[in-house]
Amino acid sequence: MLIHGFNKSYRDMGALQENLELLGYRVENLNFPLTFPDIKFSESMLKEFLLDLKYGGLNEKEEIILIGYGLGGKLIERTLRDEEVKGIVDKVILISAPLRDSVIHRRLKRAFPILDNIFKPLRVLKKNSTFKLDDNIEVGVIIGTETCGIFSRWLGEFNDGIVNYKECLYEGAKETLKIPLVHNEIHKKMGTAKYINNFISKGVFRT
């Protein structure tokens, strides 16, 4: 299952969907209101989709894998806190996903204090917020390191132009991969899909 990021739609994940399908996967490319409404609406939608899988005669041999890009990572984590969806998801792969807050968010919020009142999903990006997935879920993290754009000078040495390496690190990850791609391209390359395939099938990104 593909989960897009902030201010995007399922169309932004279209290339990854096509690439994974070429590699033999059955892919659900989901769409969420991740621009203006509170993220709780998206959490309810993802929860409903997972429960439909659980009670819809899911083959036990089929793995359920959630792939979250950008803010989609926080949407996954918040949804999986719900006890009703425990045990459904086998693996989570996070792509350039800020797990708590981000430098860009903090700086823009200083300049525009009403930012989170307009773009309500951004409220989940807080310096002291937690990010924790169930220990039974295998987690892989992919982080871009090809810097570009006007914000890159704020972000430190390793960044993809939108988020930096530290913002995406998850201590509970089984594997973390850095690849030299920018934020807006990292999820669209066949190479990224092949790394995802490796992690799903072998538990490591590079083989």
Where are these regions (language model features)?
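Serine-dependent carboxylesterase/thioesterase catalytic core
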Residues: 1-6, 10-11, 15, 20-21, ...
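C-terminal catalytic-base region of ester-bond hydrolases, centering on the histidine
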Residues: 134-207
